[in-house]
């Protein structure tokens, strides 16, 4: 059995080893393996229409994909870090993308968007929320996302739709560091 001298790693060295291991597991090896963001027409909660991914406003865009209202807490765990990233790099924008089945119907979709608009007092936040009414299976397939809707996904996407990085679940410093490294690599 191979024995590694990890007991000799202290403080910063141990963190660096852990960071490298986590980055290797969080970052995709290629955009093809990570998927391509599909062509979608959708509106934000300020009722501005977008043709995605080409009308994402950043050269690089962080999209937080959620499937259930109960996942908002997971989304919220990311927001302070995403605001810091956006403030520090003018080429990066972030969006919240609630993904809802297109079979929901026009009236229910209108009710859902209206409820979200009423529940979000900040105009800036409403502008960042773009509700996607899509074929969920086709959407997940295009992005190579698991079929499960038990967690959120955080993607770094360019305007051509290439997924450059992927993370999932609640915010962690290690996953955020991996995201920042992917942004730096793709500037």
Predicted segments with their positions:
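Short, internal strand/loop/helix patches
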Residues: 95-97, 110-148
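Short active-site neighborhood of thiol/selenol oxidoreductases, capturing the structured segment around
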Residues: 55-75
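Bacterial N-terminal signal peptides
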Residues: 13-26
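A short beta-strand-turn-helix
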Residues: 40-60
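N-terminal secretory signal peptides that target proteins for export/translocation
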Residues: 1-11
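Thiol-/selenol-based redox modules, centered on thioredoxin-like
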Residues: 141, 150-187
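Structural microenvironment flanking redox-active thiols in thiol-disulfide oxidoreductases
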Residues: 71-122
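Boundary at the C-terminal end of the N-terminal hydrophobic targeting segment
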Residues: 31-34
């Amino acid at each position: 059995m191979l024995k590694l001298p990890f007991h000799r790693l202290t403080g910063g060295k141990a963190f660096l080893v852990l960071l490298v291991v986590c980055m290797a597991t969080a970052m995709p090896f290629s955009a093809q393996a990570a998927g391509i963001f599909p062509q979608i027409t959708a509106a934000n909660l300020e009722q501005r229409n977008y043709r995605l991914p080409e009308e994402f406003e950043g050269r690089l865009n962080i999209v937080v994909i959620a499937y259930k209202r109960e996942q908002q807490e997971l989304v919220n765990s990311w927001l302070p870090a995403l605001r810091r990233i956006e403030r520090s790099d003018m080429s990066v924008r972030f969006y919240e993308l609630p993904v809802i089945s297109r079979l929901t119907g026009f009236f229910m979709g209108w009710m859902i968007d209206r409820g979200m608009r009423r529940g979000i007092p900040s105009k800036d936040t409403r502008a960042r929320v773009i509700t996607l009414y899509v074929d969920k299976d086709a959407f997940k397939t295009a992005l190579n996302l698991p079929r499960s809707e038990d967690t959120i996904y955080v993607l770094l996407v360019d305007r051509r739709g290439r997924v450059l990085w992927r993370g999932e679940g609640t915010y962690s410093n290690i996953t955020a560091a991996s995201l920042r490294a992917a942004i730096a690599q793709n500037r």
